[in-house]
């Protein structure tokens, strides 16, 4: 993660963090392994999972873990029961007054999501 992205994570201390957990499943007929990322912020469905800076960092770490393997044939992503995710954590950004941090947050989101195209 870039230095500016790390600054975004440090500057949002009260974020409800969406964790990205990876499980692996062997595909039939020797087709390889599927990595399944589950997004969950630890809250019930009334607080949907969002992507704040630390949540994006967690997703980025999960993608790093998957990218380090040579047996991955498919990557899937799912959410907690009843809801997938609603997008950027705008409540976290409402606490930020520095436009450079807000821009870094947007760049971080684009950088992490772009990685899905690398698989």
Residue ranges and their predicted role:
Residues 41, 50, 78-114:
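Glycine- (often His-adjacent) and acidic-residue-rich active-site loop
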Residues 119:
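Internal glycine-rich, Lys/Arg-flanked active-site/core loops of soluble domains
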